[in-house]
Amino acid sequence: PSCSSEEIFPAENKEITMHEYEKLVKTAYKKGDKRLALIIETLGSTGIRISELRHITVESLKYGMADLHNKGKVRRILYPSELLRILREYVKEKHICSGSIFITSKGNPVNRSNVWRMMKNLCRDAGVSEEKVYPHSMRHLFARSFYKIKNDIAKLADVLGHSSIDTTRIYIKTTGKEHKRQLNKMKMVLGTRLREGWDVM
């Protein structure tokens, strides 16, 4: 069966961009919601699932890494240096001595519905389309950013905790516009330059 263009190239209005990610983080800080800003930065810089935020604990900050338990497997993620610094500042400021860092007013770890609701509200203030913000949107952005730098899908699959690389491929699909930009950079069509007298010898 043939594939539609939507299946080959994801819609541009469905994936959050780095610029929009920055707008969300900056807006959260400006609103005084440091917890939400740090949640977004943690998701964006580590690629973890929202459901795995509970494993980001005060204790894990001592080692600069966290062990994530999911579906009977353990995955170790490392904290970027800057994230580690600001998380340590945050727990000190909020007097969080142990356990999960991102908690509700009742002291429970934030869950998927909590975070999704907060992000949707933030979108309106930041001027970012709500359609682009869904539970895995920051994870997708992390995957695309990591792959652009590392260009190693097997390593990315390990970082994301995917048992199949086929799942990882979904995360790093480029839009039609990005793909066309890459094709243009290849400069494999020589006709115009030849007609303009480009010396090929």
Model-predicted regions and their roles:
Residues L43-Y63:
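Short, charged phosphate-coordinating catalytic segments
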Residues I16-T46, I50:
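Basic, Lys/Arg- and aromatic-enriched nucleic-acid-binding interface segment
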Residues P1-E12, V25-K30, M65, E93, ...:
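N-terminal core-binding DNA-recognition domain of tyrosine recombinases/integrases
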Residues E15, K71-G72, L160, I165-K185:
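Catalytic-site neighborhood detector that most strongly recognizes the C-terminal catalytic loop/helix
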Residues K187-M201:
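C-terminal secondary-structure termini that scaffold catalytic or DNA-interacting sites
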Residues N70-E89, G99-K120:
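C-terminal catalytic core of Y-nucleophile DNA break-rejoin enzymes
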